[in-house]
Swiss-Prot record:
It is an enzyme of class 6 (ligase). InterPro entries: Asp/Glu-ADT_sf_sub_c, GatC. Coiled coil: none annotated. Keywords: ATP-binding, Ligase, Nucleotide-binding, Protein biosynthesis. One of its GO terms (biological process) is regulation of translational fidelity. This is Aspartyl/glutamyl-tRNA(Asn/Gln) amidotransferase subunit C. It catalyses: L-glutamyl-tRNA(Gln) + L-glutamine + ATP + H2O = L-glutaminyl-tRNA(Gln) + L-glutamate + ADP + phosphate + H(+); L-aspartyl-tRNA(Asn) + L-glutamine + ATP + H2O = L-asparaginyl-tRNA(Asn) + L-glutamate + ADP + phosphate + 2 H(+). The keyword Nucleotide-binding applies. One of its GO terms (molecular function) is asparaginyl-tRNA synthase (glutamine-hydrolyzing) activity. Belongs to the GatC family. SUPFAM superfamilies: Glu-tRNAGln amidotransferase C subunit (SSF141000).
């Protein structure tokens, strides 16, 4: 029995702002159903006595050295920008005035 319907995939696509065709909805419904089936199998595994871990690796907060290196000039960085304003990238407003 299917665990996820085509309508549920369409709803998820709307939430993610994805425009999916009918064939994509059908395809993704099948793929997500298979994934949920695998998750169901994993949930049946007996993990009694297995210590919970958040990260199996012992490396914590590994950073690269903070070394100054050559980079682009402001002009080079803005050269391919479609729109600039006073030496900055200009992008469309996404939030209203009150926000």
């Amino acid at each position: 029995m299917s665990q996820i319907s085509r309508d549920e995939v369409a709803h998820l696509a709307r939430l993610a702002r994805l425009a999916l065709t009918d064939s994509e909805l059908d395809s993704f419904a099948g793929q997500l159903d298979a994934i949920l089936g695998h998750v169901g199998q994993i949930q049946t595994v007996d993990v009694t006595g297995v210590e919970a871990t958040g990260n199996p690796l012992k490396d914590v907060n590994v950073f690269r050295p903070d070394v100054e290196a050559p980079s682009l000039t402001q002009e080079q960085a803005l050269a391919a920008a479609p729109n600039t304003d006073e030496g900055r990238f200009a992008v469309p407003r996404i939030l209203g005035e009150a926000e």
